[in-house]
Each structure stands twice: as C-alpha cells, then as structure tokens.
C-alpha cells in the first residue's frame, strides 16, 4: 500500500507534533491491523475497547474498596457474560497499538462517522498511545471524539510536550473521577486546557450535568453532552 496523507487532515495546533502519513486501506485491512470496533447498546456510535487488566491507574484503583474502578462495569454484566469472546479481541487490540499502520487502520474504521468513543473498556497505555489517538482525530475531522481517562499523568505529559493548544479541536479528553461523590481534582497544569474537561460519578446529587441515560432505558438517544466540554455526572451503576 502506498502512503498518502488524508486530504482533509485536521492538524494539531502545534508544530512539534509528528505527522503520521495515512495509508488508505479497506475496512477488512483495518480489522486485520487493529482489530474490530465495538458496538454498545446505549451509544449512538462505534467505540473502541481494551482489556481492563491493562489499565495502569485503573488496575491500582481497582484494589481500593469503594473506588469506581473496584466496581468497574467492564468487568461485570455483558462483558463478563461474553468474556471468552470479548477478552481475546481486547488483548489483540492492545497488541496492535504498536503496529506502524494502527493510525491508518483506525482512520479507515472511523471514516466519516459523526461521533466516536474511545475506551468503553480499558484506558490509555502511554504517551505514544495518546499521540497516535490525536493523529487519528486529526485525520478524521468530520468526527467528534470522546476520550474518557484516569491517566491524568499521560495527559499532563502530552500537554507538557506539545503545548496547551495541542489537543485536536474534535477531541474531548474527559478526566474521569476516582471515587463516587468526589468531584475530579483537575491538575493545575491541565486547568484551562482546551479540550480537557471532567466527568464525575454520583450516588444522589449530580456534580455537573446529570447523564440522561438512566431515564432513557440506558440509552444516549439524542444527548451528546459527552462529546462537549460540559462537566457530566454519571449515576453510579
């Protein structure tokens, strides 16, 4: 396959970001490179999942009783019921992140979809991983991307390396809460950074805009707040 830049690539706002050429490929080729995408019943779009066992901060938090990660939905319910099918696919995706054509594969998968969610299971693995996701976002300007994460340190490293205006305009990075009813404490270096917002988890009173899904049969329906810079609060589930 010959290399060619996407004609409508949305560049990050800084000049020190490495430009990754996008190699055109079919959906079948994309699946071979980076695995398949996932579909969840409540979401209005495709999503991408990794194994929770690979979570860095999440794995540590899961050992703390009462933390959100200790109650992780991705280790229960639908995911647990079908783990014999889901887990191998998730680990295959994890292995594929280092593939030189991973960015191209994800760009092909996403295409011109209006919305996309990163990590309905799992989380960021490294600064290089986040840089690749940013490259995917830059190469899919028609798509609004939502990236929830507890890897605050990786986000801080990204901003320190590339600058406060380096998050692609079509990407929302949502710092996720560690505990129910305790709002996210945004690191000083990430305060006021365009594209960075938070999500909290509540048992009673919402801390921000309450997610509407519980009142809508667990579905987003026409709500797209998670793809905005608004603070969102999810009911503990």
What residues fall within each predicted segment?
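Class I S-adenosyl-L-methionine
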Residues: 3, 10-237
């Amino acid at each position: 396959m010959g290399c060619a830049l996407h004609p409508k690539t949305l560049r990050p706002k800084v000049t020190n970001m490495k430009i990754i050429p996008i190699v055109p490929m079919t959906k079948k080729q994309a699946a071979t490179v980076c695995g398949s995408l996932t579909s969840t019943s409540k979401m209005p779009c495709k999503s991408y999942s990794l194994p929770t066992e690979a979570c860095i901060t999440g794995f540590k938090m899961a050992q703390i009783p009462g933390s959100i990660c200790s109650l992780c939905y991705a280790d229960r319910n639908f995911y647990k019921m079908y783990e014999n099918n889901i887990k191998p696919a998730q680990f295959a995706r994890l292995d594929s992140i280092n593939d030189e054509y991973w960015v191209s594969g994800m760009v092909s998968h996403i295409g011109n979809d209006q919305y996309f969610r990163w990590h309905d299971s799992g989380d960021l693995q490294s600064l290089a991983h986040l840089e690749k996701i940013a490259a995917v976002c830059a190469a899919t300007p028609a798509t609004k991307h939502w990236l929830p994460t507890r890897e605050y340190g990786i986000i801080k490293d990204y901003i320190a390396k590339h600058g406060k205006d380096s998050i692609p305009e079509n990407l929302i990075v949502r710092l996720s809460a560690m505990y129910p009813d305790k709002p996210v404490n945004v690191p000083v270096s990430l305060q006021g950074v365009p594209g960075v917002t938070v999500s909290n988890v509540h048992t009673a009173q919402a801390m921000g805009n309450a997610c509407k899904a519980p009142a809508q049969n667990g579905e987003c329906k026409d709500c797209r707040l998670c793809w905005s810079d608004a603070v969102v609060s999810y009911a503990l589930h």
